[in-house]
Amino acid sequence: MSALTYRELYAPAHFGNFYETAADYEIKEMLQEAIFWGFNAYGDWFDAADLKNPLNNPRAEFLTPQAIWERKKSSYRIASRLGLQTSWIVTPNHVFTDQLLPEIMAEMDGDDRFMGQLLCPSRSDGRKSILETQRGLLQDLKNTGGHIDYITGCPFDYGGCSCKKCTPWIITWGQLMADLHDEAREVFPDIRVRLIGWWWTDEEHELFKAWADSKQPGRFISLAEHIRYDETQPTPGIVLPEGCKPQAFVHIGYNNRNTHRDVYGTWGPLIAPERIEQTVRNLETNGFDGYSAYSEGASDDVNKALLAGLSSGKYSSSDNVLKAYAERYFGITGSQIESWAEWLSGWADPLSVNLTNARKEFDVLKAGVRSPEWRLEQWECRLRLFEEHSRVIEQKEWNEIANTAAERFVLERDRMYREVWKLGLVRHVLNYRYSQPEWFAHYQSQHEKFNRSSEM
C-alpha cells in the first residue's frame, strides 16, 4: 500500500479514559509507539462536559478543570517535541458550565443531533463568550510552550442551535469556525482549518460547499468525511468546497463489525483487521488525502497499529502488522509470531471464538512470551471475560455456578480497567454501565442472596 499523507491520531482526553489519566511518561510512550506504526499528527478535544473554564480561576485552585487542562497542554507539548503535527479539535458552541447564562443559551429543539452545554452564536454575547474562551485557551497553551498547527472543527456531538438565526446550523457553524480561525491566527499565525464530517447529512454537505465557495473560498483545507459503523468508506458522492481535500473520520474503537456490545473496549481490547485494511484500501483507491483516527484509549491499541501501519505504507497487510505487533510487544520469534497473529485475528468477531480452543492456544503461546506487559495482559482479560460470561449463560437457571461466574466477570472487568489500563472514574459512553451482559440485572438482584446462603 502507498502512504496516505495526513495520518492523525485523534485522542480526546476525557471521560476518565487513558488519555486523561495517563502520566507524561505514558503519553510519551504511547505517542512514540504511534509514530513507530506510522501516525504523523496528534489531536485532542477539550470536552467541556461538567467542567468550569479552567482559566476562570480567581482563587488559583487546582480542581478537575485545571487538572484536565494541564494534562492536555502537556500532551500537546510532548507531541510537538516528538515531531507530530498538532490539531486543536473544537465543537465550538459547546462551552464550559460557567458560560451557560440563560439569555445566551442555544435552542436544541427539532434535531436529535443538537446536544451539549451550548451557547447560541447568533447572540452577540454568546458569540463573544465562545471566541474569547477559545482564544484564551490557545494563548495559555502557547504561553506554556505548546504549539498548534490546525484548528479542526466539528458541528455535532456536541453542538448545534435551532433558533431561527442559526438555521441552517451548518452555515452558522461554518462562519463561527471562520471567526475562530481568525482568533486562532492571532495566537498561532500559520494555523490552518480542517473540518470533521461526523453526522453531516448530504444536504448539509451541499449547503456548506455552496456557502464556503462563495463566502470563505480556500479557508478550509480538508474535511474528514464520516465513515458510518460497519462501513469501510464514506458515503460516495459527498461534495466538498473547492480546494478542500477529502479525508476520512475513522472509528477504531470497535471490531470488524459493531455486532457486540463492546464498543470502546468495555469487554476488553478490540481488533478489526479486515475492516481497517479494507478502509485503507478504499481511501487509497478513491483519492483520499488522509484521516483522523478516533481513539478512546488503550483498548484500541492493536487497531492503532493496524491503521497507522497500513496507511503509512509500512506494511502491506493486516496480517503483517499483527505479526510485527506480536514480535515487538510480546518478545517472540519464529513460528509463534504467526500463531499470535492468527490468535489475535480470531477476536475480530468475538461471538464466533471457540473459547475452549482459544484458552488452550493462549496458554501455549503465553508460555513463549519473553516480555509480558499490559498489551498481553489485556487479551487474557478479554478471554477471561468471555469465559465467565459463557459459564453464566450456560446455566438454565440462576444458581451458584452462574453467581460465581458473574462475580468473577465483574471482578475481572474492574481489574482490567484499574490494573491493566489504569483508568480513573470512567464516565459517559466509556463506562461499562451501557454495555452490561444480558444477565447483569438478574445478577444484581440475586448475588447478595447467594452470598448470604454460602456464608450460612
Where is each model-derived feature located?
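Contiguous, structured surface segment used for ligand recognition
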Residues: 1-3
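Transmembrane beta-strand segments of Gram-negative outer membrane beta-barrel proteins
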Residues: 5-9
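Catalytic domains of carbohydrate-active enzymes that cleave complex glycans
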Residues: 281-289, 298-300, 312-456
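Catalytic-core regions of glycoside hydrolase
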Residues: 12-16, 26-28, 35, 40-47, ...
